[in-house]
Each structure stands twice: as structure tokens, then as C-alpha cells.
């Protein structure tokens, strides 16, 4: 019986000591993986930030182009006063001095060609 007890105690001590070593080893592996994961997350975060900045720059550029285009589309309709030096009449209209009924206004108006 004593040999069985001694053998059992020996196996128990070996299992506990090896198990403890495995636990420490597992803890070290987990720490390494966590550190690698953090560096990977930092890299992914920086990459995403760069892509977002590029996208934002493109959107701002498109907005400024749209603003320029919308300013070009603005025009003055028919029968509306216009400036002789800077006519902004819509296409198909010309900035002319009014005849007869509008002479007293001393202004130019957009009329059909």
C-alpha cells in the first residue's frame, strides 16, 4: 500500500508542477498574442484613418467642383434687370436696353434674341 501511495503522490506532484509550467507558458503566449494583436490593431487603425482622410479630401474636392458648377448655372430670366457690363442672362437671352415702355427705368433687361 505504501508504494501505491508514494507512486500516487509522485504522479500528483509531477502533474501539478508540469501543469503549473504549462499555465505560465500559456500566460506568456497569451501576452505575446495580445501584444501582437495590439500592434495589428494600431496598424489597421492607421490604415483606416489614412483611407478616411483620402475619402474626405475627395469629397471636399467634389463639393468645391459642384459649387463652381452651380455658380455657372445661375442666370437671369427674361424681363429681369441685368448689368450691361456683366450680363448673366440665361442662354437664349440677351441683355438689352428696353424699348419704349421701359425707357424711364434707365436699366438693361434680359430679352429673347
Curated annotation (Swiss-Prot):
The keyword Secreted applies. It comes from Cyriopagopus hainanus (Chinese bird spider). InterPro entries: Toxin_22. Residues 60-83 are annotated as: Disordered. It comes from the Eukaryota. Belongs to the neurotoxin 14 (magi-1) family. 01 (HNTX-16) subfamily. The presence of a 'disulfide through disulfide knot' structurally defines this protein as a knottin. This is U11-theraphotoxin-Hhn1a. Probable ion channel inhibitor. Residues 60-69 have a biased composition (Basic and acidic residues). The keyword Thylakoid does not apply. Residues 22-74 form a propeptide. GO terms for molecular function: sodium channel inhibitor activity; toxin activity. Expressed by the venom gland. Keywords: Disulfide bond, Ion channel impairing toxin, Knottin, Secreted, Signal, Toxin. Disulfide bonds join 75-90, 82-95, 89-110. GO terms for cellular component: extracellular region.
Amino acid at each position: 500500500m505504501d508504494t501505491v501511495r508514494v507512486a500516487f503522490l509522485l504522479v500528483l506532484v509531477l502533474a501539478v508542477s508540469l501543469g503549473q509550467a504549462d499555465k505560465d507558458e500559456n500566460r506568456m503566449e497569451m501576452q505575446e498574442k495580445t501584444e501582437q494583436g495590439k500592434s495589428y490593431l494600431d496598424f489597421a487603425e492607421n490604415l483606416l484613418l489614412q483611407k478616411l482622410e483620402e475619402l474626405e479630401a475627395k469629397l471636399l474636392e467634389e463639393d468645391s467642383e459642384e459649387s463652381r458648377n452651380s455658380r455657372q448655372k445661375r442666370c437671369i430670366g427674361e424681363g429681369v434687370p441685368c448689368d450691361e457690363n456683366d450680363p448673366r442672362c440665361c442662354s437664349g437671352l440677351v441683355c438689352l436696353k428696353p424699348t419704349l415702355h421701359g425707357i424711364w427705368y434707365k436699366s438693361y433687361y434680359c430679352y429673347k434674341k
